[in-house]
Amino acid sequence: MSALHDPDLRGFASDNYSGVHEEVLAAIAAANGAHQVAYGEDVYTEELQRVFRREFGEQAEAFPVFNGTGANVTGLQSMLPRWGAVVSAGTAHINSDEGGAPEKVGGIKILTVESPDGKLTPALVDEQAWGFGDEHRAQPLVVSITQSTELGTVYTPEEVRALADQAHERGMRLHMDGARIANAGAALGLPLRAFTSDAGVDVLSFGGTKNGMLLGEAIVVLDREASSGLTFLRKTNMQLSSKMRFLSAQLLAMLGEDGEAEPLWLRSARHANAMAARLRSQLDEAVAAGRITGLAFTQPTQANAVFATLPAGVADRLRAAYRFYDWNPATGEVRWVCSFDTSEDDIDAFTAAIERELAA
C-alpha cells in the first residue's frame, strides 16, 4: 500500500500525532516470524520483566497493555476496594481526558483539587483526604499524580517523596500516570527509579506511545502489597494482548540494553524537550526584543509542551498550516507539543509564522 498521508505535514497538537521511531519498527520486525506462546508467556515479555526490574528495582512487576487509559484504569482498580476513591488534580488525564472510563469501567470515584500548575502538594491533597471511616463518603485511598503533568510541569523526586510519605502515613497509596514519564526523566536528568520507586511510588503507568512507540504502555507495580488482581483485571478490562511479544518488543527497544548510557526513551524524550525549549526561547527572545506583541506564556516549559495565550483569531490563522489545540478557549490559551521527530526546522518555521501574525 502506498502512503495516504502528506509526508511533509507537521504540527504541534500532540506527541500522539508523531510516527513510530525506526528503532521501534526494527524491534517489531525482529520479534516477528516463527511462533511464540501467546498472552504474555513469550520470551520477549519474560525479558521485559527482567529489564523493568533493572530500571525500577527487584520488586517491580510489569503488565503490558494497549493504551494509557487502560493502564490508568486497570492500575487504579488494582489499588482500590469498591468503596475507594482517588485524589487527583482537576487537570489530571484520569479526570478530564479519559471519557469517564475510571468511573464507568473502573467504578472509581475521583476527588479533584485545583492546582495552578497541574501538580499536587500535601496541602492540596489535604483538601480531599478526609472522612476516613465515614460510610457516607467514598474513601480517599489513592493519590494519583501525572509525571510530567498535563500542563508540562515536572515533579522533583523530593516533591514525589513528600506526597508518598503523606499518603503512606494515612494508609493511602501513590499512583503515577507516566504517559510522559520519559520526558520527566529527561528533564530531571535522573534515572527512572529516582523519582518513582526510590521516591515511594506504589504503582505507575509507563508510557511509550507518546515517545515513539506504535502502541502500548505498561502498568508497573512497585509495591506488590499496593496492588492485587492485575492478572485478572487486565483481561476483564480488555487490555490483555494475545500477541504480547509485539508490545513487549517495543518496550524493550525503548528501555535499551544493559549498560546503555542513552536508551531510546531518553534520547527521544530529551529531543522532544529540547525542541519545546527552543520554541519557548525563540518566542521569549521575540517578545523581549519587541518584535511581537500579544503573546504570554502561562506555564513554565519543563518538558515537551509550551502553553501560551494568543489574541483572538491568531490561533485559527496559524492552524491553517500547523495543527494544535486550544487549551482554554475562553482565555485564548493554546498548547504546543513537541515530539521525538520534531525538527529544528519545524520549530524555526513555526516561530516565523507566529512572528508574522504577532508582528509589533
Question: Where are the language model's segments positioned?
Answer:
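Conserved PLP-enzyme active-site core in the AAT-like
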Residues: 2-321, 326-342, 350-358
